[in-house]
């Protein structure tokens, strides 16, 4: 897995955002699984994916990698697990548009946290890019926002906040491999899903969707982002991550014929520019 770690940071961030952009489509495609069942299976396959990546990367030193990640890795994993729970809860209880819009606010949290905690200056070009990108997001999803469920909207805020905190930890300790933190997050959220589910077994169709979500969507997504963030400024991470909000509606259009509005197309073009 050395070739992945040698890829440019911004490219890895984009690949991670690309993977994560399928989240809404996958969660909305479950047929009979409950919120907590989705969380359990998604987190289970995610944990296995991260563990497999660590074994392939470290081989006989896999356990040592957890030890070396230390307290930053453990704390980062626990914090991120709340984001995982909030993401599934939001997608289950409110619209994909609402959730994507709220998640896109991570760009603000990243820039602000980076400024205060890492002393990363926000230059005029970056500030302009943030404003331009946020304008694109507002145009893209603002026209289709619905009131939604208050609980789902509030839960969605846990994702950009916990993601920003994780990136701060990654940037603060660039020499520490934070991929083990992803395993901690997966196991923690899997345990939460298990404890809150009345039963674990779901249909084969939904188990397959859980596999897609855990392996492809969040598995590759957060592995790429965690590695890429080590060499990418926090504000730049936020700007690139906005592509998740652009691509999500595109997948909905391609696979479930959900047509984006004219404002959505214009907003997406602004962000990609």
Regions found by a protein language model. Give the residues of each.
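Glycine-/small-residue-enriched transmembrane alpha-helix faces in small-molecule transporters
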Residues: 1-39, 78, 86, 145-172
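Helix-helix packing/entry segments at the starts of transmembrane helices
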Residues: 11, 99-105, 170-188, 218-254
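Specific alpha-helical transmembrane segments that line the substrate/conduction pathway
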Residues: 37, 43-48, 88-119, 235-253
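Loop-to-transmembrane alpha-helix entry segments
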Residues: 67, 100-103, 119-139, 146-155, ...
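Hydrophobic/small/kink-forming positions within alpha-helical transmembrane segments
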Residues: 21, 25, 51, 77, ...
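Hydrophobic transmembrane alpha-helices of multi-pass small-molecule transport proteins
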Residues: 50, 54, 80, 112-113, ...
């Amino acid at each position: 897995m050395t070739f992945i770690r040698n890829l440019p940071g911004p490219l890895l961030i984009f690949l991670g955002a690309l993977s994560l952009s399928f989240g809404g489509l996958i969660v909305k495609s479950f047929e009979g699984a409950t919120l907590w069942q989705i969380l359990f299976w998604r987190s289970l396959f995610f944990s296995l994916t991260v563990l497999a990546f660590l074994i392939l990367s470290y081989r006989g030193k896999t356990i040592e990698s957890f030890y070396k990640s230390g307290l930053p890795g453990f704390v980062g994993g626990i914090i991120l697990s709340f984001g995982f729970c909030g993401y599934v809860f939001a997608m289950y209880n409110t619209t994909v548009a609402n959730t994507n819009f709220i998640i896109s606010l991570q760009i603000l949290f990243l820039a602000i946290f980076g400024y205060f905690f890492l002393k990363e200056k926000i230059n005029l070009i970056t500030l302009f890019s943030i404003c331009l990108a946020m304008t694109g997001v507002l145009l893209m999803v603002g026209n289709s926002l619905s009131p939604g469920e208050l609980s789902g909207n509030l839960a969605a805020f846990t994702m950009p906040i916990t993601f920003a905190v994780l990136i701060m930890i990654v940037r603060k300790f660039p020499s520490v491999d934070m991929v083990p933190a992803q395993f901690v997050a997966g196991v923690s959220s899997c345990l939460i899903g298990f404890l809150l589910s009345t039963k674990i077994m779901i249909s084969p169709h939904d188990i397959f969707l859980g596999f897609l979500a855990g392996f492809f969507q969040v598995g590759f997504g957060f592995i790429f982002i965690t590695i890429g963030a080590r060499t990418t400024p926090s504000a730049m991470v936020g700007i690139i991550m906005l592509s998740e909000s652009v691509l999500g509606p595109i997948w909905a259009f391609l696979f479930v014929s959900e047509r984006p509005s004219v404002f959505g197309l214009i907003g997406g073009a602004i962000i990609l520019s």
